[in-house]
């Protein structure tokens, strides 16, 4: 068999300025621009291999070891766009293999729970589009390719870059200017860290796609959000990132998370993505910032109960002292921190905090958290020698 294979990894991104609402559902065009931080693939990534060859009988997809349908319209649109770009390449260079006419096998795996509020669809579609683009040898840059990923999952376009990324909503009806751009790369502000508190790994009650359209059609707060609040915050947050101004970045991140969830609550019927554990984590973050009399941690919640806490490396001991006091018995610490580091966090809390708080810590909060994931800002899609496809058969290894 003549099988061609290409593989890539793609990252999770977590928005600090939220995308919520579509002005065109078919093209996945947003009602507002958004900003995100790309997270390290050492901790959260999708690995995707794509294969093609004249002998493959049909397009097929395997996700986390199981066959999945490739029939949904979004995936089909992504593949059609990629094939169109490959076809144009073949027209220019007639000696190229006619890959645009051949079927595709795509094998993908996540190292985190799928559809659990950890932006799995973003990493998944980004990896799919980049792997096929690599397989096809497409010359387009990632900003162009991001417009295809956007059609699969809106936030996927932001996973085509590392560091700090904006999805520009654009103005054109055909979506030709709705794409991802990089605000700053990893090296610009490498000290950014993230702690993910996994509140639930279950599927969401209200999927993002249906939830956001419910908000668009029924929320009065949403209209104010997209008209004035987000455009103002977009400029302020981009400037804070460029200036490495954590206090401003953190305040805007928390305010925008609150604004997003307020529009969900203002939808009719209301949509609840945060739960009691989520809200208690918000209170904990404000308690920490008030104790130190400075903003050292920022929370944000996507369309789910999981919390993402942003902080700088210089404040790791101060923040993790609090987190270890509350979540010290939860899983996840051992993946990132040594026993000595954890002892340092506990000592920091005992020396600087214990007995000095105006209110007691929430002794029950840890029960609502399944595990913690500690990570940091990271790069965009990466080439990899790892392959999930057997080049002899075109099937999963």
Swiss-Prot record:
Catalytic activity: (R)-5-diphosphomevalonate + ATP = isopentenyl diphosphate + ADP + phosphate + CO2
Domain of life assignment: Eukaryota
EC number: 4.1.1.33
Quaternary structure and interacting proteins, as annotated: Homodimer.
UniProt GO cellular component terms: cytosol
InterPro entries, alphabetized: GHMP_kinase_C_sf, Mev_decarb, Mev_diP_decarb, MVD-like_N, Mvd1_C, Ribosomal_Su5_D2-typ_SF, Ribsml_uS5_D2-typ_fold_subgr
The keyword Transport is assigned to this record: no
Species per Swiss-Prot/TrEMBL record: Eremothecium gossypii (strain ATCC 10895 / CBS 109.51 / FGSC 9923 / NRRL Y-1056)
Protein name, as recorded: Diphosphomevalonate decarboxylase
GO biological process: isopentenyl diphosphate biosynthetic process, mevalonate pathway; sterol biosynthetic process
Listed Pfam families: MDD_C, MVD-like_N
UniProt record similarity statement: Belongs to the diphosphomevalonate decarboxylase family.
Pathway the protein acts in: Isoprenoid biosynthesis; isopentenyl diphosphate biosynthesis via mevalonate pathway; isopentenyl diphosphate from (R)-mevalonate: step 3/3
Entry GO MF terms: ATP binding; diphosphomevalonate decarboxylase activity
Region feature Disordered, mapped onto this chain: 378-397
Positions that bind (R)-5-diphosphomevalonate: 19-22, 74, 153-158, 209
Physiological role: Diphosphomevalonate decarboxylase; part of the second module of ergosterol biosynthesis pathway that includes the middle steps of the pathway. The second module is carried out in the vacuole and involves the formation of farnesyl diphosphate, which is also an important intermediate in the biosynthesis of ubiquinone, dolichol, heme and prenylated proteins. Activity by the mevalonate kinase ERG12 first converts mevalonate into 5-phosphomevalonate. 5-phosphomevalonate is then further converted to 5-diphosphomevalonate by the phosphomevalonate kinase ERG8.
Keywords linked to the UniProt accession: ATP-binding, Lipid biosynthesis, Lipid metabolism, Lyase, Nucleotide-binding, Steroid biosynthesis, Steroid metabolism, Sterol biosynthesis, Sterol metabolism
């Amino acid at each position: 068999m003549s099988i061609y294979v290409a593989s890539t990894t793609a990252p999770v991104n977590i928005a600090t300025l939220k995308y919520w609402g579509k002005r065109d559902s078919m093209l996945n065009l947003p009602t507002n621009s958004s900003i995100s931080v790309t997270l390290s693939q050492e901790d959260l990534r999708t690995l995707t291999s794509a294969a093609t060859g004249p002998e493959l009988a049909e397009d097929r997809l395997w996700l986390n070891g199981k066959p999945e349908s490739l029939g949904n319209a979004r995936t089909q649109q992504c593949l059609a766009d990629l094939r169109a770009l490959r076809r144009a390449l073949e027209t220019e260079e007639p000696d190229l293999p006619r890959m645009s006419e051949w079927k595709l096998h795509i094998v993908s795996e996540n190292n985190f729970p799928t559809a659990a509020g950890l932006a799995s669809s973003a990493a998944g579609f980004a990896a799919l589009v980049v792997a096929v683009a690599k397989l096809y040898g497409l010359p387009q840059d990632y900003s162009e390719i991001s417009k295809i990923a956007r059609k699969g999952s809106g936030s996927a376009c932001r996973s085509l870059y590392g560091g700090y990324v904006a999805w520009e909503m654009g103005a054109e009806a055909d979506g030709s200017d709705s794409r991802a751009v990089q605000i700053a790369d990893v090296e610009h502000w490498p000290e950014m860290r993230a702690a993910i508190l996994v509140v639930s790994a279950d599927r969401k009650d209200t999927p993002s796609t249906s939830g956001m359209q419910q908000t668009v059609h029924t929320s009065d707060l949403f209209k104010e959000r997209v008209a004035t609040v987000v455009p103002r915050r977009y400029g302020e947050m981009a400037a804070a990132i460029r200036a490495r101004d954590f206090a401003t970045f953190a305040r805007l991140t928390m305010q925008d998370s609150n604004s997003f969830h307020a529009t969900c609550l203002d939808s009719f019927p209301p949509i609840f993505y945060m739960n009691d554990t989520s809200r208690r984590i918000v209170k904990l973050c404000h308690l920490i910032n008030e104790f130190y009399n400075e903003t050292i941690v920022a929370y944000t919640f996507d369309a789910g109960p999981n919390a993402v806490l942003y902080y700088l490396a210089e404040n790791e001991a101060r923040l993790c002292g609090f987190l270890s006091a509350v979540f010290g018995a939860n899983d996840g610490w051992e993946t990132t921190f040594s026993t000595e580091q954890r002892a340092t966090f506990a000592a920091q809390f005992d020396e600087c905090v214990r007995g000095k708080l105006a209110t007691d810590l929430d002794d029950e909060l840890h029960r609502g958290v399944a595990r913690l994931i500690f990570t940091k800002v990271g790069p965009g899609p990466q080439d990899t020698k790892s392959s999930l496809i057997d080049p002899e058969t075109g099937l999963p290894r």
